[in-house]
A protein has these predicted regions:
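Preference for intrinsically disordered or flexible, low-complexity segments
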Residues: 1-215
Length: 215
């Protein structure tokens, strides 16, 4: 995995920023709303319906950024535990402990892959928000506090070595970028979510892993 590293003040990496927008720019990315899935709306082990954080039309976004970062022809949906009634941060937090990862993998977050032709379902906590995708250069010394897609692992992400070679990094989601619950869709407005996909996806209901970290 390529990582943003401190290799000199002029070292820059290209990422594609995700920013909520009032108009649809055809990016293929949506915060919230519903999605095309061939499965029931996912619930966590406590019986709580998960929040759909972001949906990606993979081919559209691949074309937008000019590289095959996501599985072509598919729809990627990222779900995470959310509750307005209880503290849920610990259910989706991972800092490199295998027990944390095992807990999340029980269903406290889900990464689903589907076909565009699958049924459209919307049981989400908040409505759809269009997302603008913009190319941006990031200094390798910086800690990017915004949402983006990229194959470059951002500085500040820790503990991902536990994932081994089975996954690859594709996106960072900054909770404060999503205008829902004062930016608290991931527990705190400064919580950062990280999305890794499996290099080989045999099960569309288990296409990757999504977790958060809080500094």
């Amino acid at each position: 995995m390529k990582e943003l590293k401190n290799v000199g003040k002029n070292s820059m990496d290209t990422v594609y920023q995700l920013k909520a927008n009032t108009s649809d720019d055809g990016s293929g990315v949506v915060f919230g709303g519903g999605t095309h899935i061939a499965f029931p709306w996912p619930v966590n082990p406590l019986g709580e319906e998960l929040a759909l954080v972001v949906t990606i039309d993979c081919s559209v976004l691949n074309h937008k950024i000019g590289e095959e970062l996501f599985p072509a022809g598919k729809v990627l949906s990222v779900f995470s535990t959310y509750s307005s009634d209880r503290y849920f941060l610990d259910d989706i937090t991972f800092h490199g402990d295998s027990e944390e990862l095992e807990h999340i993998s029980k269903g406290y977050s889900r990464v689903l892959l589907s076909e565009r032709s699958d049924d459209f379902i919307n049981e989400n906590y908040f409505g759809p928000i269009s997302v603008e995708v913009t190319k941006r250069e990031v200094n390798s010394e910086d800690f990017p506090a915004f949402s983006f897609v990229s194959k470059v692992i951002p500085r500040g992400l820790i503990g991902y070595g536990v994932l081994g070679d089975e996954y690859y990094f594709v996106a960072q989601i900054y909770s404060g970028d999503i205008p829902f619950d004062d930016g608290g869709i991931l527990g705190l407005s400064d919580a950062t979510g990280y999305l890794f996909l499996r290099k080989r996806i045999d099960d569309f209901s288990n296409a990757g892993v999504f977790f958060i970290q809080v500094s």
